[in-house]
Curated annotation (Swiss-Prot):
Protein name: Cytochrome c oxidase subunit 2
A single GO cellular-component term on record: mitochondrial inner membrane
Xref: InterPro entries: CcO_II (IPR045187), CcO_II-like_C (IPR002429), CcO_II_C (IPR034210), Copper_CuA (IPR001505), Cupredoxin (IPR008972), Cyt_c_oxidase_su2 (IPR014222), Cyt_c_oxidase_su2_TM_dom (IPR011759), Cyt_c_oxidase_su2_TM_sf (IPR036257)
Signal sequence, start to end: none
UniProt enzyme class: translocase
Mitochondrial intermembrane topological intervals: 1-14, 88-227
Residues binding Cu cation A2: C196, E198, C200, H204
Pfam family, one: COX2_TM
Role: Component of the cytochrome c oxidase, the last enzyme in the mitochondrial electron transport chain which drives oxidative phosphorylation. The respiratory chain contains 3 multisubunit complexes succinate dehydrogenase (complex II, CII), ubiquinol-cytochrome c oxidoreductase (cytochrome b-c1 complex, complex III, CIII) and cytochrome c oxidase (complex IV, CIV), that cooperate to transfer electrons derived from NADH and succinate to molecular oxygen, creating an electrochemical gradient over the inner membrane that drives transmembrane transport and the ATP synthase.
Subunit structure: Component of the cytochrome c oxidase (complex IV, CIV), a multisubunit enzyme composed of 14 subunits. The complex is composed of a catalytic core of 3 subunits MT-CO1, MT-CO2 and MT-CO3, encoded in the mitochondrial DNA, and 11 supernumerary subunits COX4I, COX5A, COX5B, COX6A, COX6B, COX6C, COX7A, COX7B, COX7C, COX8 and NDUFA4, which are encoded in the nuclear genome.
Membrane topology listed for this record: Multi-pass membrane protein
Segments traversing the membrane: 15-45, 60-87
Originating organism: Pan troglodytes (Chimpanzee)
Family affiliation: Belongs to the cytochrome c oxidase subunit 2 family.
Amino acid sequence: MAHAAQVGLQDATSPIMEELIIFHDHALMIIFLICFLVLYALFLTLTTKLTNTSISDAQEMETVWTILPAIILVLIALPSLRILYMTDEVNDPSFTIKSIGHQWYWTYEYTDYGGLIFNSYMLPPLFLEPGDLRLLDVDNRVVLPVEAPVRMMITSQDVLHSWAVPTLGLKTDAIPGRLNQTTFTATRPGVYYGQCSEICGANHSFMPIVLELIPLKIFEMGPVFTL
């Protein structure tokens, strides 16, 4: 999860997020290289007194500055397309959960567990227990197993919302009248936080998402939902 004064991305809790972090570092190194080359060329231009105004044609130079950017774009596009394909891939999920966005709370349906349905509201400051996070904790957490593929069906009852959990690398829009889906496999237990990531009205900042990830054996033993 996030912590105070954090500069980088949150620690990965899913294979997709691990791939996103690697791609982020890969793209950032290319950007740093481009910035260095531009600054170096600018430095040479400002400090040298040598000029050449008689050049009317530079075929080699034009070839280089046409091919080199194309190669750089390919180096960025190929891993990006690979990750984009992975995010849309559905690999035989163990079970399915439906998430419905409202102004300003979430409803969850465990369709594979007897049609369990519950609402998840942000905890007001007066109801926070020691250790709870202000504006992030909820009254009913979503309990999920680790090391099991989960399919999340996401929609909205009223306006546009977005179901996002950064540590899992998830962000899927909740659109009225449309059912979107995303899949993920958590790799380690813990409590992870997300928020609605689409401006949806006055209380947009007050509809957090809390996932409690537990070992699969414990999840299969019986009721673990804190309702």
